[in-house]
Design a protein with these regions (language model features):
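Short, solvent-exposed loop/linker segments at the N-terminal edge
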Residues: 96-101, 201-210
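Edge beta-strands of extracellular beta-sandwich domains
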Residues: 176-188, 290-299
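Short flexible loop/turn segments that cap and initiate beta-strands
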Residues: 111, 117-129, 181-183, 209, ...
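Low-complexity "stalk/linker" and mucin-like segments enriched in Ser/Thr/Pro/Ala/Gly
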Residues: 135-147, 238-264
Length: 300
């Protein structure tokens, strides 16, 4: 709805396939040397499948969105591509006012084989990746309808019902040992702005950039995933506001203007240095929210 695609990531384009199809082919076919994904990073243009639906104007199938923020599918790829980094990611978010008691599936992307899901302390059971799935036994229409290939790489609880509170997952290794856990909570009302720079020290060359992740969080620091507040930015000192993006493929807001609405509670603000070294102060404000200030150092 709203010219967006679901975070469950079950939609594929006509000239492509689901990530799991390629994963499994690479594993089974020794003549395949690698994998090509279009695209890693969303870009302006080709708003598949909303080609003619205004105001859609950027791609939706990237692993990372237009603001440089990883999508849920990023963690699916990482769980398979990079076994050296622990991945334990829960989706979707858990703010679904009006869906109380309705079936709301929960997916977990992880590099571990098994996980157990809890909603408000009640176990929803364990799921284990189905290693029996092959390219040849999972391509028929019934297997596709039952998401058979997905069960090889995703842990899916398809019958969970939404209730506000805490979603928790415990991951287990191949020997059955609990090795990791993660929680996600229903966020309260938007309370403050949170700023996090990818680098707090940049070069004073008039070109270097600091990419700042902007979040709207509640009093307890939980991301507010449905927030759409407009943030206004001011930069003081030896730098200036370069651009911003929120990852919304339907947003027509200017990238250069020092104000923008967050999308799903987040956006990215970009601060540039000047050729004069010193402190750069980024201030973010929004009506009804506690403001945030971030200091970045620039030097030669």
């Amino acid at each position: 709805s709203g010219f967006q695609l679901s975070s469950y990531d079950m939609t594929t384009i006509g000239w492509g396939c689901a990530p799991e199809v390629q994963f499994k082919m690479n594993e089974e076919y020794s003549f395949m040397s690698g994998e090509f994904v279009w695209t890693g990073f969303d870009y302006l243009g080709e708003p598949t499948p909303y080609y003619s639906d205004w105001p859609s104007h950027s791609s939706l199938f990237g692993i990372i969105d237009l603001a440089g923020i990883p999508k849920d599918r990023y963690y699916l790829y990482r769980s398979h591509w990079n076994k050296d980094v622990e991945t334990l990611h829960i989706l979707p978010h858990w703010n679904w006012e009006g869906r109380e008691g309705e079936v709301t599936p929960v997916f977990v992307y992880t590099n571990y084989p098994t996980a157990e899901l809890f909603i408000n302390g009640k176990s929803q059971g364990k799921r284990t990746k189905d290693l029996s799935v092959t390219v040849h036994n999972s391509g028929d229409s019934l297997s596709t309808a039952n998401f058979k290939r997905q069960k090889r790489y995703r842990l899916m609880w398809m019958d969970t019902k939404y209730e506000p509170g805490t979603v928790k997952v415990i991951a287990y290794d191949k020997d059955g040992n609990a090795v990791a856990e993660k929680e996600m909570k229903t966020a309260g009302k938007p309370y403050r702005i949170e700023l996090t720079a990818d680098r707090d020290k940049i070069m004073a060359d008039g070109k270097d950039l600091s990419f700042v992740t902007v979040k709207i969080v509640d009093k307890d620091g939980n991301l507010c995933p449905t927030a759409a507040n407009e943030i206004t930015f001011k930069v003081k000192g030896k730098g200036y506001y370069r651009a911003g993006a929120n990852g919304d493929p339907t947003s027509l807001e200017s990238f250069q203007a020092p104000h923008m609405k967050v999308f799903s509670g987040m956006m990215t603000a970009i601060v540039s240095s000047t050729e004069e070294p010193g402190k750069i102060t980024l201030e973010a404000t929004s009506k009804g929210l506690k403001k945030a200030t971030l200091v970045i150092e620039s030097g030669k």
